[in-house]
């Protein structure tokens, strides 16, 4: 029987259905989460072979120990997944640390997390992508905008969804954005398209 660890199987609330179908397919479904077992939906409880509660999914050491426990108890882990973009890097680190080869590893993260790195892979696949510039200073951005014209869209190079996305339509908005960037986590890299 294959062992499948599902990280945070309770969120979103409909994810129990993934666990049910994995179990129906003959997998040994093992959940790791920070919600108390007694608060899990009955459907989720029925879909898991075992659940390990951690204090916080943000604490890598706790989650690591939970995976180690399941490995000791059930043997080699074949799959580990959360189906949640927020946990992509955590999932990859656990797969790498436990030699679980059925998914992204730590070394794969840049090409799937950074918009600028994704473009290279889209181009290799023949998918057109918008030209881009990594936001640096006014002169560098202005030079790029002279090539492509306004409006441009600026967003974090490594980000989930559309949060912190800015549409710039003129030089004044460009200056306003660059001021914003200098005060709001200045270590965040932005991509301009």
Sequence positions of predicted segments:
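ATP-binding N-terminal substructure of ATP-dependent carboxylate-amine bond-forming enzymes
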Residues: 1-107, 139
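A generic structural signal for short, non-catalytic loop/turn and secondary-structure boundary residues
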Residues: 24, 47, 128, 146-147, ...
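Conserved aromatic
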Residues: 57, 112, 135, 168-171
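Short, high-confidence coil segments that cap the C-terminus of an alpha-helix
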Residues: 75-77, 149, 187
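A conserved helix-loop-beta module that forms one wall/lid of the active-site cleft
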Residues: 95-164
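Conserved ATP-binding module of the ATP-grasp superfamily
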Residues: 128-131, 151-154, 167-193
């Amino acid at each position: 029987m294959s062992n499948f660890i599902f990280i945070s199987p309770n969120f979103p609330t409909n994810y129990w259905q993934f666990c049910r179908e994995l179990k129906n397919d003959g997998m040994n479904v093992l959940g790791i989460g920070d919600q108390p077992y007694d608060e899990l939906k009955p459907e989720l409880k029925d879909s898991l072979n075992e659940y390990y509660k951690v204090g916080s999914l943000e604490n890598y050491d706790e989650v690591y120990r939970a995976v180690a426990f399941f490995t000791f108890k059930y043997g080699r882990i074949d799959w580990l997944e959360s189906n949640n973009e927020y946990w992509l890097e955590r999932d990859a680190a656990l797969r790498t640390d436990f030699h679980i080869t059925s998914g992204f590893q730590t070394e794969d993260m840049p090409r799937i997390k950074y918009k600028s790195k994704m473009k290279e892979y889209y181009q290799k696949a023949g998918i057109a992508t918008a030209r881009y510039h990594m936001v640096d200073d006014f002169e560098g951005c202005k030079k790029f905008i002279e090539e492509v014209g306004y409006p441009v869209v600026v967003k974090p190079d490594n980000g989930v969804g559309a949060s912190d996305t800015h549409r710039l339509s003129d030089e004044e908005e460009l200056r306003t954005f660059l001021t914003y960037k200098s005060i709001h986590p200045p270590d965040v890299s932005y991509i301009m398209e």
